[in-house]
Amino acid sequence: MAFISRSKRYQSKARVYLSLPRSSNSSLFSLPRLFSTIEETQTPANANPETQSPDAKSETKKNLTSTETRPLRERFQRGKRQNHEKLEDTICRMMDNRAWTTRLQNSIRDLVPEWDHSLVYNVLHGAKKLEHALQFFRWTERSGLIRHDRDTHMKMIKMLGEVSKLNHARCILLDMPEKGVPWDEDMFVVLIESYGKAGIVQESVKIFQKMKDLGVERTIKSYNSLFKVILRRGRYMMAKRYFNKMVSEGVEPTRHTYNLMLWGFFLSLRLETALRFFEDMKTRGISPDDATFNTMINGFCRFKKMDEAEKLFVEMKGNKIGPSVVSYTTMIKGYLAVDRVDDGLRIFEEMRSSGIEPNATTYSTLLPGLCDAGKMVEAKNILKNMMAKHIAPKDNSIFLKLLVSQSKAGDMAAATEVLKAMATLNVPAEAGHYGVLIENQCKASAYNRAIKLLDTLIEKEIILRHQDTLEMEPSAYNPIIEYLCNNGQTAKAEVLFRQLMKRGVQDQDALNNLIRGHAKEGNPDSSYEILKIMSRRGVPRESNAYELLIKSYMSKGEPGDAKTALDSMVEDGHVPDSSLFRSVIESLFEDGRVQTASRVMMIMIDKNVGIEDNMDLIAKILEALLMRGHVEEALGRIDLLNQNGHTADLDSLLSVLSEKGKTIAALKLLDFGLERDLSLEFSSYDKVLDALLGAGKTLNAYSVLCKIMEKGSSTDWKSSDELIKSLNQEGNTKQADVLSRMIKKGQGIKKQNNVSL
């Protein structure tokens, strides 16, 4: 039994009386006219137009004429308009806007002059939420407003079944006899199908079995519903048992029954069983229809038995059952599945010559097969037909396949036409579609065309559309970014990649290319910004990118920033080469940043890179540090050199310091050499001692000379007597006496050594 889903006409009868002014036309103020949602003229039940007297007819006609000639004047409050909303719509709006409370229930009760089943049905049908409909259904009955009939029960059961509220639906169904409403088969069919859609096959079977216990007749309608439910879940053996039981009960299967059985058997891949039922169908004198043939053809195609499918297809035409677009599409799909593309094209041409227009499913089936077979000319022509007829395929991934296949075939013009076809068919092109074209244009060295596509991609911000699922691949954006960075268009490349980063892309190659590109173009600050982004996101930085960035800073005359970039390079585990170290150190030194240059030199020494090649530069920095009073720093660098197996020229440094009067620095450097037993020339001792004595620092000279002699180093310092004299003059007689004895002792040892020789 079919059910009508549209709203029913509501008619009401008055149960209240209003105080109205008298009028000769009583029908003008009839209560149904005032309260009914549908305005219509009602006549008494016993008033048959054919049996009315002529006087009554003339009186009625007179009243109608007077009503038409006399205008009805009604006054409304200013600013308000008459509400023509239907009563059921008003109730639905109230339930949607207000909580389900006693106050709302009373408002609805006061609104309705008299309840009838059509009003309840329409409210259930118009409710925006299921819980509102269920509350209204239960309230109207519990409040004694109405006793639900068969239609309202059926409506509620269907609504609950659609949202899988199956326990509620079942309770309402089983409670119907207590309310005096008899069951019918259609209600159980709804519940069987609802359980089936929810995947609860066992409950569908129980409901079907319960029909017999409850005395509800089971016809072919309920059997068909059961077959559909159990076959959808692959229970073909159960379906066979119930089919045999149905036949034994005297219920004759229909063509629809056999179509369901065949569909289910093929779904479960039971070819032999399907063939037996097909023959049984013919034996019973039931002729196959187009649905039967289509099911069988589709089944043969699933088993890749295209010869059998072709025979059925021919038989279908011989039985004067014209193949439909479904039949042709199924055959095309089957041939493509077994790589018989030419046969698929033959069926397609036959279809068109028969006057049957391909639909979106047909095109969606044929195009991927042509692409896989490399028949791109045919695919191009079919795409043109789709554009001419404005038929878009069901699956938009077909366009991606066309783009890839046409590009692979080397026909970039045809690939570009695919984008135009998408625009014609109102299919939005995604970033992935543009990516395929850009990638293949780069492979063909057609960079200008690739850049035009990229401009469109960037301007329309296609990459940023969150509803898109087809993203641009690294193989697409990396080549164009590299080209732009190598050809003075790094800014455009950065705009592209910043859009990609908003979609979560953190590609190492692309970011390093951006650093290199900005550095080559003389924009080191932009390179460093990219570098910081990579650092924050943990993206590895390449050594070559750092080198270009450092050189870019130095070419701009910014050695400090170059040093910062070099520090980052070292922190990332990269080791700059000797020439890069030298260029940074020299730039800093020439800029007067001696200590900063010293720190870079320390890194170079620590990494043991190019020390021998840069000893001249190291000597300059050490000298500058000592001359500026940064003695401890200089000594630290010298010590680091020694630890790495290299020796600074201390004699040269001592000579320079002594000559320029930097006695304290010379003293500390000499002490450093003596403490570590470094090899020093005697002339260096003499120069330092002379400088100290000349500066009046007799005690310092005394201390140094004592250390020299304690180390066993003999000295022929000519000014030793002068030092002793100065010590005595300054009152340091004790030191003078000690020094005299040490000198005499040293001279005695020297004489003994000469005699022994």
From Swiss-Prot:
Residues 70-82 have a biased composition (Basic and acidic residues). Its main location: mitochondrion. Keywords: Mitochondrion, Repeat, Ribonucleoprotein, Ribosomal protein. GO terms for molecular function: mRNA binding. It holds the Pfam family PPR_3. Residues 39-55 have a biased composition (Polar residues). One of its GO terms (cellular component) is mitochondrion. The keyword Metal-binding does not apply. Residues 39-82 are annotated as: Disordered. It is found in: Mitochondrion. The keyword Ribonucleoprotein applies. One of its GO terms (biological process) is response to cold. InterPro entries: Pentatricopeptide_rpt, PPR-containing_protein, TPR-like_helical_dom_sf. Coiled coil: none annotated. PPR repeats lie at residues 149-183, 184-218, 219-253, 254-288, 289-323, 324-358, 359-393, 395-429, 430-464, 473-507, 510-541, 542-576, 577-611, 614-648, 651-680, 681-715. Component of the mitochondrial ribosome large subunit. Belongs to the PPR family. P subfamily. This is Large ribosomal subunit protein mL102 (rPPR5). It comes from Arabidopsis thaliana. The lineage of its organism: Eukaryota, Viridiplantae, Streptophyta, Embryophyta, Tracheophyta.
